[in-house]
């Protein structure tokens, strides 16, 4: 009898399968438009929030648009950054990037939060992506968290909720700015202006000075303006997840 009571206590006290799982989604695109230049995801926009969340005990999976090895933007390989340096010796995370899940194979019900890491590659394969749209809506409408960093909000440009409205409509968010795109000389290279496109869908674009930390949390949509904002995004997700749990 005591064994039965203990068993039932453990079963009913166990959290749901999604309660402590977070999904990071990376780009699979590695070419910078018409330029002879490689791109991909920005390493720090994965490592900074990843370690905040993993160190807090959350289970983290990594997916990409096509699956397999996700391309890292060569310009983001700064190993003087402590989180990037940690990544070099992190066999688990390294393996996750080498062999990402394809987004079509992801079960959205497994996750309490999704994080769209940035990098210029996202401008080619995150926007107008039906698989991303379905994943985002599923997690958000179950009460989960949607997050995106820098160019990662390209994933949010076409997401419509079940009521037919854009997720970003009337919502405050941060994203890579036109000024920052101009600073890196890629305004005419990227396929669209992220800032202008989000605003055209009704988003209230909240921006800080170029290359400074700026994170916005509006009703479980957590966004960061640039690579400098990545760690704070992780902390904001952590705070929000603790509130949900």
Give the location of each predicted region:
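N-terminal signal peptide c-region/cleavage motif recognized by signal peptidases
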Residues: 13-15
